[in-house]
UniProtKB/Swiss-Prot annotation:
Its EC number is 7.1.1.-. It comes from Bdellovibrio bacteriovorus (strain ATCC 15356 / DSM 50701 / NCIMB 9529 / HD100). The chain crosses the membrane at residues 14-34, 80-100, 130-150, 172-192, 219-239, 280-300, 325-345, 365-385. NDH-1 shuttles electrons from NADH, via FMN and iron-sulfur (Fe-S) centers, to quinones in the respiratory chain. The immediate electron acceptor for the enzyme in this species is believed to be ubiquinone. Couples the redox reaction to proton translocation (for every two electrons transferred, four hydrogen ions are translocated across the cytoplasmic membrane), and thus conserves the redox energy in a proton gradient. This subunit may bind ubiquinone. NDH-1 is composed of 14 different subunits. Subunits NuoA, H, J, K, L, M, N constitute the membrane sector of the complex. PROSITE patterns: COMPLEX1_ND1_2 (PS00668). GO terms for cellular component: plasma membrane. It is found in: Cell inner membrane. This is NADH-quinone oxidoreductase subunit H. GO terms for biological process: aerobic respiration. GO terms for molecular function: NADH dehydrogenase activity; oxidoreductase activity, acting on NAD(P)H, quinone or similar compound as acceptor; quinone binding. It is a multi-pass membrane protein. The keyword Mitochondrion does not apply.
């Protein structure tokens, strides 16, 4: 029985990974459409509006175009690196996003399957729950720098190599500020576990300082009210990590040469594009999780929502599923807002020069992140006296 349950859990976790990856890939065309319509709205034009209602079928036309383009490889390219780079571009985003809790767990009661009794079972609405979720996500996301170098070196083109070196230097530079910006959050909540961080942000704002409990019922208990500087630094560094404007020095979409993926076209280019949106999704998901309560509803604790659902649903399993559905919708509303901010900023701010980009990362954001970490540690120590 124990072996069967282990196989069952491995199968369920494998299926969840596949489903989350498919959700990410399927979300990309919708985000592309939203970006096109959003940029048109910002620039006072129409955007895609000819193919289908509101231009929605344009997504299918683009997919067919990418799949039917000629597959070629430059003579000077290194075949393994050239073909492996777009594949590996998808992996960090999908694997890292799978570790983010998208909703509260669903409690499944006992049930019969394959002639055996199974359960009770706690179904996590995430690919996998590991105790050091933050470290895992940052570690996997950082592998994207290798993808850039693989594409630049494997293309056998000096311009793609220079673009890859610039892009990887940018990514590595801002990873320092990105990592330090959330050290304050880790110290504040005292855990690396993402679910525990989410649950720590339930209800209205309340904290203890020098033996006194301070409450503000008109504010949600979100991390941004404890770490406003960390939130600003994290979100700014996330733009640089995902190579989005105003930090798109890796490619420069308005220029003739596309940086590290100059020699890629068709579906191979599209895979890099999906990878970029994957990093945007990770950044938006982590922003929601660290600083905006994750899947929790503002002012409402999980226990209060469970109590309400128990009075509405006929069984405990249905009540748990209802709570998970509500939390999933809440997470996606917050998540969608930050995805829109990525689009909004791209079509609003101009691009930095490369020297400005490096100065901002090393001379401004890194010192501020260090100062925020030191001050947070000092305040937590004083509050504990």
């Amino acid at each position: 029985m124990g072996m069967g349950k282990d196989i069952f859990e491995i199968t369920v976790n494998g299926l969840k990974l596949v489903v989350i990856f498919l959700m990410m890939v399927q979300a990309v065309p919708i985000l592309v459409w939203l970006e096109r319509r959003g940029s048109a709205f910002i620039q006072d034009r129409l955007g895609p509006n000819r193919v289908g209602p509101l231009g929605l079928v344009q997504l299918l036309a683009d997919a067919v175009k990418f799949l039917n383009k000629e597959n070629f490889m430059p003579q000077t390219a290194k075949p393994f690196l050239y073909y492996a780079a777009p594949i590996f571009a998808l992996i960090p985003g999908a694997v890292a996003f799978s570790a983010i809790p998208l909703s509260s767990p669903i409690q499944v009661g006992t049930f019969e399957m394959f002639g055996s009794t199974w359960g009770p079972y706690t179904f996590l609405v995430q690919g996998y729950d590991i105790g050091v979720g933050i470290v895992f996500i940052l570690g996997v996301s950082s592998l994207a720098a290798y993808t850039l170098l693989m594409a630049g070196w494997g293309s056998g083109n000096k311009y793609t190599l220079m673009g890859a070196l610039r892009a990887s230097a940018q990514t590595i530079s801002y990873e320092l500020a990105l990592g330090l910006s959330i050290v304050g959050v880790i110290m504040l909540y005292g855990t690396f576990n993402l679910t525990e961080m989410t649950l720590a942000q339930q209800g209205p704002l309340a904290f203890s300082f020098l033996g006194h409990t301070i409450t503000a019922n008109w504010l949600p208990n979100w991390g941004i009210f404890y770490q406003p500087v960390g939130a600003l630094l994290f979100f700014s560094a996330a733009f640089a990590e995902s190579n989005r404007l105003p930090f798109d020095l890796a490619e420069g979409e308005s220029e003739l040469v596309g940086g590290f993926h100059t020699e890629y076209g068709g579906f191979k280019f599209n895979m890099f594009f999906i990878g970029e949106y994957g990093h945007m999704m990770i950044a938006s998901g982590l922003m929601v999780l660290f600083f905006f309560g994750g899947y929790t509803i503002p002012y409402v604790s999980v226990a209060e929502l469970n109590e309400w659902a128990a009075g509405v649903a006929s069984t405990a399993g249905k009540a748990s599923a209802l709570v998970a559905l509500i939390h999933f919708l809440v997470f996606n509303i917050k998540f969608g807002f930050f995805m829109w901010v990525f689009i909004w900023v791209r079509w609003t701010l101009p691009r930095f020069r490369y020297d400005q980009l490096m100065d901002l990362g090393w001379k401004t954001m890194l010192p501020w992140a260090l100062a925020n970490t030191i001050i947070t540690a000092f305040v937590i120590y004083i509050a504990s006296l």
